[in-house]
C-alpha cells in the first residue's frame, strides 16, 4: 500500500492493479532462470515483510480493491504468483514457500490466518512450507535472534542521522 516506507525514511507508492500480473509473471521467469541454472527446486519468499508478505499482512495491506481487506482478498496476489510459479516449475521441480507463522507485532498476521494461508499454498501446489516469522523492517529481533552486527549493518547507510539513530537505539 502507498504510504511511509518501513525500510527507509521515504514514501512509497503501492503497486497499481494493472502492474500485478507482470509482477507475478516475474516470479515465473525467476523459476525458469533457476531451472536453466540447473536447480531442481525453488523457494518462494512469502514472509518477513517481502512483497507477498506485504499483501498477506493486514498491517501493510491497506488496499481498497480486491487485493485488500479480507484474508481471501489479501491472498489473491499470492495465488497469482503461485499460478505462474507452478506453471514454470512443471511436475519435475519442487516448490517450497517460506511464510510467516506470525508477523511478530500487533496488527500483523497471526497463526489463525496463517493456517488458512498454509492450506491455500498447498492447494496452489507448494510441496513444502518453510515456517518462519517476523518482519525485518518492523521487528528485526523477531527474525534475527542474538547479537546483531549493528555497526556492520549501518556502515553503508547513506543518511547520517538514521545511521547514528540505529547505532544508538539498536
Regions found by a protein language model. Name each.
Residues 1-170:
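Flavin-dependent oxidoreductase catalytic cores
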Amino acid at each position: 500500500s502507498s504510504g511511509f516506507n518501513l525500510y527507509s525514511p521515504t514514501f512509497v507508492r503501492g503497486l497499481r492493479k494493472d502492474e500485478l500480473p507482470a509482477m507475478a509473471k516475474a516470479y515465473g521467469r525467476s523459476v525458469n532462470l533457476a531451472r536453466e541454472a540447473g536447480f531442481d527446486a525453488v523457494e518462494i519468499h512469502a514472509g518477513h515483510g517481502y512483497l507477498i508478505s506485504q499483501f498477506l499482512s493486514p498491517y501493510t495491506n491497506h488496499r481498497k480493491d480486491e487485493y485488500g481487506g479480507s484474508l481471501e482478498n489479501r491472498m489473491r496476489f499470492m495465488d497469482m504468483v503461485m499460478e505462474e510459479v507452478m506453471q514454470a516449475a512443471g511436475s519435475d521441480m519442487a516448490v517450497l514457500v517460506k511464510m510467516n507463522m506470525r508477523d511478530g507485532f500487533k496488527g500483523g498476521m497471526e497463526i489463525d490466518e496463517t493456517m488458512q494461508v498454509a492450506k491455500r499454498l498447498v492447494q496452489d501446489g507448494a510441496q513444502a512450507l518453510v515456517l518462519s516469522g517476523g518482519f525485518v523492517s518492523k521487528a528485526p529481533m523477531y527474525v534475527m535472534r542474538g547479537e546483531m552486527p549493528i555497526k556492520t549493518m549501518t556502515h553503508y547507510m547513506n543518511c547520517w542521522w538514521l545511521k547514528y539513530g540505529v547505532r544508538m537505539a539498536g
